[in-house]
């Protein structure tokens, strides 16, 4: 582990979107956290995702269960590792989803409309 990894909370495991989807289907205890801004979810989100924008993340960690595996996802895979590192530092069992919702959609995986987002904007 490099110095930067140590300062940022250590390395976080990363999986692709297909593996994330398999985990969500196989284990109903897995929580997926979407760290995008609400406006970014207008085009849809991963089914069952909990929306906690990265800008609010530190103050909202208590909303997440400490006894369940957590996946983090964002739009393209740049913000979710930051959230994952925060979770790891706080003692959560966390895995980052590479490629974000762009890769999720490209893979043809299910997307759902977020409540309250229809026709926005």
Predicted region positions:
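Conserved G/P- and acidic residue-centered "switch" motifs that form tight phosphate/ATP-binding loops
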Residues: 34, 77
């Amino acid at each position: 582990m490099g110095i930067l990894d140590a300062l940022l909370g250590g390395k976080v495991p990363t999986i692709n979107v297909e593996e994330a989807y398999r985990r969500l289907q196989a284990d109903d205890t897995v929580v997926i956290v979407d760290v995008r801004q609400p406006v970014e979810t207008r085009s849809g989100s991963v089914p069952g995702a909990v929306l906690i924008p990265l800008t609010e993340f530190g103050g909202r960690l208590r909303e997440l269960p400490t006894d369940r595996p957590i996946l983090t996802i964002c739009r393209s895979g740049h913000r979710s590792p930051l959230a994952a590192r925060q979770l790891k530092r706080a003692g959560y069992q966390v895995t980052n989803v590479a490629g974000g919702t762009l890769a999720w959609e490209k893979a043809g995986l299910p997307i759902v409309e977020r409540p309250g987002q229809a026709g926005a904007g």
